[in-house]
Amino acid sequence: MRALTNLSQIATGEGRSFLSGERQADVKVYENHSILIHGGRIAEITRAVPPGVEEIDCGGGVAVPGFVDPHTHIAFAGNRVQEFYMRIRGTSYLDILRSGNGIYRTIRDTVNADENRIFKETISRVWSAVRRGTTTMEMKTGYGLDQRGEEKILSAIEVIKNTGPISVVPTYLAHVVPQDVQENAYVEGILETVKRNRQRISYADIFCDAGAFSPEASRRFLEAAIAMGIPARIHTNEIENVGCVKKTRGLPIVSYDHMIHFDDADLDIVKENGSSVTLLPITVFALNEAYPDARRIIDRGIPVSIATDISPLNMNDDMIFAMHLAVRNNHMNAEEVLNAATINPAASLGLAEKKGTIESGKDADLVVLSARSYDEIPYLYGLDIVSMTISRGNILYSRGDHGITDTSEA
């Protein structure tokens, strides 16, 4: 047994399911307690550490649950640096896509890479996320286009899931329709790939938006995946509102992701479907779009998660930066974003029984931060405040100096 000691504060949501509405802001705070860890799980939150227990001095910092990143495109090869400058000069996302670049560029790079290269580039990014406090990550396919390419990405994800440092949730993503290919025929093909790999994936996802799949094709794909017993997610309303949410009425979709452009009727359907919303504020930052108002979603009783959406478009794996943007621009408070980065995404990924909160019996997935209080986390977004990342009781990253970041004299 070991104990995390000298913690000024432990802050966590509670429970084994989504927190929504007013409860999304419920955070339990322990002052000057220790966390006992045994067998990779949280044994107890206590004031008194038993004798003979290995003590890990946390330097007066704050412990929160390990961050759960529920939406990533981290598995790919290559980069899109030229597109970054094109967007800065005013070229739109859709114009880049229609020219055969954007997602199509990454598809070409990834299809031409072998599995080992995809693995090496991806695991490097995973370790970067670990240093920023992430202990669980959803990873999508989507850059392979055909069965062979998607299975190559999925194999790289599986290696990371089985041998890597963090918990991984594989998702099959129907990303875009190949140029000069008929949409209905392509959907038939990808459904065969999903069927062939249904034991290897935890979720099925589709990008329903301008320049991607139509609402009709998206519903067909989602219905088929659900019929196979695969839970469904959806990318939607990122570029435009083309009616994707309305087309999903009655489907048990776990999470509607992006949701930049929505109306009240869309939120009614999300609520009726018993679904959640995952906001991706770093992507909005990268696209220089207007941020959606999370208050409209939370106040309807819909649970909200946040994610990094790390991808070649958005090379950022920092959940703390996502929390900062969600407070600053999506109008969430410190308590809501803490739960949006921990328990709610854990519930979104079907892991809330064992992850997402600091409670006895759950996995010891923890982040120790050089702060005095959890509400400083979004505020200190630009500083190196992650002092320790722990996954299932194993210390994955330790900065060594666990001292408090002092901003009191500024």
Swiss-Prot record:
Subcellular location: Cytoplasm
GO BP of this protein: L-histidine catabolic process to glutamate and formamide; L-histidine catabolic process to glutamate and formate
GO MF annotations in UniProt: imidazolonepropionase activity; iron ion binding; zinc ion binding
Cross-referenced InterPro entries: Amidohydro-rel, HutI, Metal-dep_hydrolase_composite, Metal_Hydrolase
UniProt entry tagged with the keyword Cytoplasm: yes
Catalytic activity: 4-imidazolone-5-propanoate + H2O = N-formimidoyl-L-glutamate
Residue numbers binding N-formimidoyl-L-glutamate: 143
Cofactors (names): Zn(2+); Fe(3+)
Protein name per its UniProtKB record: Imidazolonepropionase
Native source organism of the sequence: Thermoplasma acidophilum (strain ATCC 25905 / DSM 1728 / JCM 9062 / NBRC 15155 / AMRC-C165)
The organism's taxonomic lineage, starting at the top: Archaea, Methanobacteriati, Thermoplasmatota, Thermoplasmata, Thermoplasmatales
